[in-house]
Amino acid sequence: IYDLYNELMEYDGGGDIVSVMRERLAARGDSALSGIRSSDISEIFLFFDYDFHNSQLSVGEINRRVEDMLALFADETENGKLYINYPMIESIRYTKYLPDRDYVRYAVSREQCRDFKRLARDFSAYGSLDHILFKDGETPTKEKYIRVKDNWEYLKRMNVCKANLLVNGVDAMPAEKSDISQQAIFERQVLLYVKPDDSVAILNSFPVFIYEYMK
């Protein structure tokens, strides 16, 4: 996504994100966006891992890049809206049995993030993602459908409440979705976790996205 950001900035932030993405895919032999124009797409959402364990970059440089991307990717109807996973997408697995009332307290150090995929797998009460996903071609039973739906509702509430606690100091669902903007979440992560403790509060952006999109 940062490469995409750099390409758009070559046009002073005024580039066409759909055209840039189409060209990038075509260069790899992927025709998924062939024939698709900007006018065909009304909303764009981007998901990014807060890769602060990257040993090639300082934390300061990582944070500067995230700030730049959040500024550019701030509107789903324009350049797209960016959502950030802390520390990475595998945070969706970092729970005990749902609902996990201790989730609000979970954080991870920068050093632990180097092996976070294994850490999340070992920590999880679930041996796979079957509790939140259907397999390709699966016809779920009514019981599984309800279970998966309920688990996403738990994940949504857990992550949104945690984001609200992080930003506003209130462990409850926010009154407005703007109360937990991605910019505000990032700023509070840096202030409360990254700078003082070299850590991040575990937070997954997919449940937050679902909350915002459905609200």
Question: What is the role of each PLM region?
Answer:
Residues 2-8, 28-215:
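C-terminal accessory helical subdomains adjacent to catalytic cores in phosphodiester-
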Residues 1-27:
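RecA-like P-loop NTPase motor core
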